[in-house]
Amino acid sequence: MILIAGPCVIESRELIMKVAESLRKFNEMSGVEFYFKSSFDKANRTSISSFRGPGLQRGCEILAEVKEKFGYKILTDIHESYQAEPVARVADVLQIPAFLCRQTDLLVAAASTQAVVNIKKGQFLSPQAMKHSVEKVLQTRSARAYTPQSGAASSDTKAAQNSARSSDTEICAAQNGAQGGANDGSSALGAQNSCGARSGVQNSAHACDASSAANSAQSASQPSGEGMHDLARRYGVWLTERGSTFGYGNLIVDMRSLPIMREFAPVIFDATHSVQMPSIGATSGGDSRFVPYLARAAAAVGVDGFFYETHPDPAHALSDGPNMLNLQQLERVVAQTLAIQKALGF
């Protein structure tokens, strides 16, 4: 099971080192692939006066220190295309924020590195629509030699390093194979769009973004097939569920989205942002009481990993305090989800 945990934002070097020290047990836990998470810049804060973090250079220095001292794999988010290459020198996983999950240039820039790309599902999107974001990364990486760095990826690196033509053929074959189970023509349309890509990054991005709204609606009744999930795992593409907009200032989690998205990529469940209440006044609110309940529900449905923002004193955190899990609660929640997944054979 993948476990991603850490403070929302790098508040200070001292806080990050304190939290990193407290998380040692998870890096040594059997059956857990641990990633330390924190953001160097919260570029999407509600208010211009809200704390954003230390910035790219200092933030990456602190994350690099965590990596060197504790041996942790690192996950952090990027908001602009130019950030992908320098951040990937430190981070094992580049995270695409939910609000930016359709931004082709950002996805292509992240895919052009050797880091795993974790795409958070937009609160405004259906789970089926996330297939197109995955395709953008797959098409970009099929035009390059890509070697997975994460243990969550397949060890079949030889196939991942094939020529652009053979990789494109494989992706298209996987999506065409999905059509046999769907019988509605939608997967064939998606495959046709994918097969139109060329080795150039720009052409790849354009081909993957060519699906129409009508095609998305048609495919909603049946997700893509198993082959695409395997390709996403090998090429280092994850999806993260973090709730869906439910009126103003509220989110809900439709657990059906987990198996739907898992048809075409490994899926992480973000239990902390799922209890967020966006834009309550000048900051976002939330209710962390519900984190354990949603995490256990997701474990019962079956996911590839969990994402928890955690803090020693959430009430005084500089970002996302109301929905962060107290460090003292994290071990119990992780143990419960592991037990559920083990009991159900996930």
Task: Spell out what each predicted region is.
Residues 55, 72-80, 92-105, 116-127, ...:
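Catalytic beta/alpha-barrel core
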Residues 1, 30-34, 68-74, 90-92, ...:
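Short, well-ordered coil/turn segments that N-cap beta-strands
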Residues 1-4, 345-346:
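N-terminal amphipathic alpha-helix/helix-capping segment at the start of soluble metabolic enzymes
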Residues 114, 118-143, 227-310:
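Catalytic alpha/beta core domains of metabolic enzymes, predominantly
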Residues 52-74, 110, 114, 258-267, ...:
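Alpha-helix-loop-beta-strand connector modules within alpha/beta enzyme cores
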Residues 7-13, 35-56, 310-320:
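Glycine-rich, proline-tolerant flexible connector loops at the mouths of alpha/beta enzymes
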